[in-house]
Amino acid sequence: MRFGTLFATLGSNDKKNSMLTFVEFIERAIKRNWDLPALSNYREAPMSYGQVGKMIKKIHRALAECGIAEDEKVVQVGRNNVNWAVTFLATTSYGTVSVPILQDFSIPDLENTINHSDAVLVFVSDYIFENMDVTKFPKIRGFISLDDYRVLYSIDEKVNQAFANYNNDIDVSRDKFALKHIAHDRLAAISYTSGTSGHSKGVMLTHGNYATNVEFGTEVIPLKSGDRMVSLLPLAHAYGLAFEFLTEFSLGCHITFLGKIPSPQVLLQAFGEIKPGLVVVVPLIIEKIYKAKIKPAISKGLPKFLLSVPGLRRIVYSKVRKELEDAFGGNFYEVIIGGAALNKEVESFLNRIGFRYTVGYGMTECAPIITYAPWDTARKFSCGYPIRRCQVRIDSPDPMHIEGEVLVKGTQVMMGYYKNPEATAATFDSEGWLKTGDTGTITADGYLTLKGRCKNMILGASGQNIYPEEIEAQINNLPYVVESLVVERGGKLHALIVPDKEKAEKDGLDREKIMIEFEKNQKELNKLMPNYMAISKIELQEEEFVKTPKKSIKRYLYN
């Protein structure tokens, strides 16, 4: 029996109160903040909201002169920068369908995705275009540089002429600036998933899906006009787009784009210089800081001694918290962690030291937000409660104690998968609930805790549900482990481990000694696990696991 009566109403099915359209959020932000800095590339001069408005209108003019019709598809692929951001605002507010593609897609994947999308125009970074064969794109009328809006290649003279005129001035002022009305149910973008199961799908997101996310962000995140933001996650991914750009833009913030994901040194420099009012990261960033810097520092000498004395450990906690806050600029309201599960050891430590963090939950199919709680009401190991206009249900006879699949309804839920009715039908149940593919439990007051992915679950010999992610999180905390994957082989659990060769070499450990170290840790780890979750064998991997552009492991390659 599916539990639904109580939990389906947590969050809200709020359809009584009207919501601004996505384009209205953009227009309002530009008019309210006309003279304030809006966007800048790292260490470059900022562009004001008024300049963004003028740039949007120039792109609108070019699209019209190209003969691009509303609802036609327009691709953008390249590194994060001001032009990428403004192009997204321009194409969606013009009425075309944006197709943002991650810059890390291979050229064959890029070809397949662009052709599958039925796009007619491509905005692309020069360095990507250099490796593209234009003959592979029969429907594309032109390729436009995301670096400077010049035509890279075109089969249509109208495209050449339209973008030759791009730099011509256009009469735009705060009083005259206006964008057309586009209804919530119109298609805004097709966002292609990066495919941990080997198949990329085009998620059809509406203007209402984006408006729901922006409305949520502007209501719960206490940023104001002029506050600063660092954007480091890919804008072509729903998480980075919604919460490092669209929300902050709608609030009048000044957003700085770092381009590609920077080295740790550049990232810390940027946070120190910009001092953002909010930090949005994936768990990997926090986990790397913890494993490389914090854990070694508190595991020896005076810090280790102080942590062993109950009355003194707060001294260490306070010092570590201050250093971690300073690493992110020292001026943030909170650090939002999302995009993947946060390691429990790391989260427990952040919780103990009183670090201002929260873990949210979402997926591309929800553009992306599903649950969230501000840091001061967040609960350890939970990812918050349903946002406004969203309902969450657990497919379980006892949702508070027995995990089941997380089901979602709301105004942020996608239309379906582009040209894939079979996948769309399989993703929604008979009552119209989106099947997330994640399992979890929920409390009486709506806090969601995730267990793992349905498709990754391994059925134990006695029928137990084994979530490999839980075991991998423990393994990844061990010394000399870069990453791990737990798989079933012959009814036994095997741990595939990528060793930290650099650290092992530094400590004088060859492959044989690393294996001895891992086998010793395996025995200790198995003592902490239920018998049915015990690891029977460790296999060392010479190379890191193959990943999607979003940096998720392609698990299907190792099963």
Label each PLM-derived region with a short phrase.
Residues F25, S93-N165, G491:
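Structural core segment of the AMP-binding/adenylate-forming
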Residues V316-L448, C454-M457, E472:
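Conserved AMP-binding/adenylate-forming
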Residues D14, S18, P37-N81, A85, ...:
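Conserved AMP-binding/adenylate-forming core of the ANL superfamily
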Residues F105, V122, G410, M415-G416, ...:
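AMP-binding/adenylate-forming catalytic core of the ANL superfamily
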Residues Q103-F137, N213-V230, S263-G277:
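Conserved ATP-dependent adenylate/AMP-binding module captured primarily in the ANL superfamily
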Residues S48-G50, A188-T212:
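Conserved AMP-binding A3 loop
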